[in-house]
Amino acid sequence: VESTIIDLTCTPPRLLRPGGITLEQLREVLGEVAVDPAVTRLMGEGEKPRAPGMKYRHYAPKAPVTVVQGAPAAAARYIQDHMAPGDGVICFDEYAGLFDGHPLEQLGPSTDVPEQARRVFDALRWFDGTDVQQIWAQCPEAAGIGLAVANRLNKAAGFHIVQAE
């Protein structure tokens, strides 16, 4: 996950792109920090991007991506229940065995978000060498460095996000 981008020209400062420096770390130093709406949703028609990578499906593979949020076990079950033969999966390491026979990239252990940050781009790009029609992705909680990982997955998915129950 590349750099954190923050706008210091406004009050309070505004997080434009989460990265290696977490929102929590920024708040320890700066106090109040707002999160730009483009971090958590698609930009609307006519909205101007305030930082690189805000507007478009940055780093998106050719196949459409669906991000499944929620507890890791629930997200894995949701993917199992909804995926079609030949769909690809980006999952936490401990759930890889549930998707035998499907093209798969492991994101890292569900508890190791820094490792997920190191793997997320390679996991997304790997699928461009396959013929999958759909990619399903587990997603870490959007806290700490997980906010950056979730942001990159959600952007790659064009914010096509479902919540596992």
Give the positions of each predicted feature.
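Active-site-adjacent structural elements in enzyme catalytic cores
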Residues: 1-165
